């Protein structure tokens, strides 16, 4: 049997319990077709980069699958039909990763010192004083003329 990583996005307006129900439903489909589901990670409700079917957020779920190709095709067919699934992607892998995925690893960006990897202008130093801003002449607004 082949190894796969399968990620799907569910609509934002379903509950986490319904997302778990979807996971159990697709687990059952894979097991009924002779496969096994290993790790299941629920990444939670995350913002989308762009709107998908009028949704700005989605529930993300990762599943590690060890199953024959027909089982994966059946899961994808059922996801295509289900209106709660916005997108899905299945990738064949050589082996499953051990431990949490990259999305589940906590990466704290603020624990780095100030000069490390913050951008191309890190060496600028402090900003100069701009002075009193009320001394600048103001343009009259056109609607007050």
Swiss-Prot record:
Residues 94-145 are annotated as: Disordered. One of its GO terms (cellular component) is cytosolic small ribosomal subunit. SUPFAM superfamilies: Ribosomal protein S6. InterPro entries: Ribosomal_bS6 (IPR000529), Ribosomal_bS6_sf (IPR035980), Ribosomal_S6_plastid/chlpt (IPR020814), Transl_elong_EF1B/ribsomal_bS6 (IPR014717). It holds the Pfam family Ribosomal_S6. GO terms for biological process: translation. GO terms for molecular function: small ribosomal subunit rRNA binding; structural constituent of ribosome. It comes from the Bacteria. The keyword rRNA-binding applies. Keywords: Ribonucleoprotein, Ribosomal protein, RNA-binding, rRNA-binding. Disulfide bonds: none annotated. Belongs to the bacterial ribosomal protein bS6 family. Binds together with bS18 to 16S ribosomal RNA. This is Small ribosomal subunit protein bS6. It comes from Sinorhizobium medicae (strain WSM419). The gene is rpsF.
